[in-house]
Amino acid sequence: MTAVTECFRSLRSQGNCALIPFITAGDPDLSTTAQALRILDRAGADLIELGVPYSDPLADGPVIQSAATRALNRGVKLEDVLEIVKNAQGEVKAPIILFTYYNPIYHRGIDVFLDQIKAAGVSGLVVPDLPLEEAESLLQPAAAKGIEVILLVAPTSPPERIQAIALQSQGFIYLVSVTGVTGMRKQVATRVEELLDSIRSVTDKPVGVGFGISEPTQALQVKNWGADAVIVGSAMVKRLADNSPSDGLKSLEEFCRSLKQAIQ
């Protein structure tokens, strides 16, 4: 059984909801990212989503876009990101999910890319600009290498598309809570509860909710609606961006612990 699926199976058996923090690799620098992985792991992260900096991040809001730009300006490349993941093996227990756009995969070639991330110790993959109609070209070879490709359900997805995504998504289903890009919002759309029910009607696969969750009270609300995981990105990235590396890591740890406590 692959690491992401095993993590959710273990959590479900205990009646627990997963916490999945997201950070952008290389912001503010690679050393801080390496420390952040370890800090998030010990602060209660069940899985960790690590964003590969990309120049045209269509799904990302201003906080994560800015983080990616800073990392790219520092010269951060995929190989640097994978080196961080590789060095974390044995220390970081939480499975690491790589968040990357399709272009870097295409340019390397699917098999080469998958071999690279597998060797580094990546367990899962989120590709936000990969349409369902083209997902099979990545899903099958990834599964053969033990890497789970997590597909996204949008608030605008019709029932038949939700069913198709639920059927093919591996590890869990990533429910996008809002139409638009990532970012912090004052409240989580109540339609999320309805969308969770729609997904539940067609699959028993775990569902993680992301985009717009920035406070412990919101995380608890999403958990109470029936989510198997809460995904928090921009609010994590902002804590690293707004402080010195040492203060940012301290703030990151405190925030992660507060989220974990809220959903336990």
Swiss-Prot record:
Annotated EC: 4.2.1.20
First-tier enzyme category under EC: lyase
InterPro entries hit by this protein: Aldolase_TIM, RibuloseP-bd_barrel, Trp_synthase_alpha_AS, Trp_synthase_suA
Species lineage: Bacteria, Bacillati, Cyanobacteriota, Cyanophyceae, Oscillatoriophycideae
PANTHER family with a match to the protein in the record: TRYPTOPHAN SYNTHASE ALPHA CHAIN, CHLOROPLASTIC, TRYPTOPHAN SYNTHASE, ALPHA CHAIN
Gene3D superfamilies associated with the record: Aldolase class I
Gene Ontology, cellular component aspect: cytosol
Molecular function as annotated in GO: tryptophan synthase activity
Protein name: Tryptophan synthase alpha chain
Family the entry assigns: Belongs to the TrpA family.
Assembly: Tetramer of two alpha and two beta chains.
